[in-house]
Design a protein with these regions (language model features):
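Conserved N-terminal phosphate-binding loop of PLP-dependent enzymes in the Aspartate aminotransferase
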Residues: 1-82
Length: 82
């Protein structure tokens, strides 16, 4: 569909069970955001950040995004054949 979001929110899966949330945005949106305008009292918790880093390293190290794409394509093909 060639859709490019301006913002994406992440949560549960990012921390592998440790509570965390994140907001990803384009540079254009980020430049319009006031400094500290999206912060929280709990933002930057070291344990949550370490957990998120470990999850991201696993995703990258195991090439999981490519695998998800391949499995998704296979799943769609199988559904179409029904």
């Amino acid at each position: 569909y060639d859709i490019q979001p301006d913002m994406v929110t992440l949560a549960k899966g990012l921390g592998g069970g440790v509570p965390i949330g994140a907001l990803l945005m384009t540079e254009e949106v980020a430049l319009k955001m006031p400094k500290g305008g999206h912060g929280t009292t709990f933002g930057g918790n070291p344990l949550a950040c370490a957990a998120a880093l470990a999850v991201l390293e696993e995703i990258e190290g195991r090439n999981l995004l490519q695998h998800v794409s391949e499995v998704g394509n296979y799943f769609q093909e199988q559904l179409r054949s029904i």
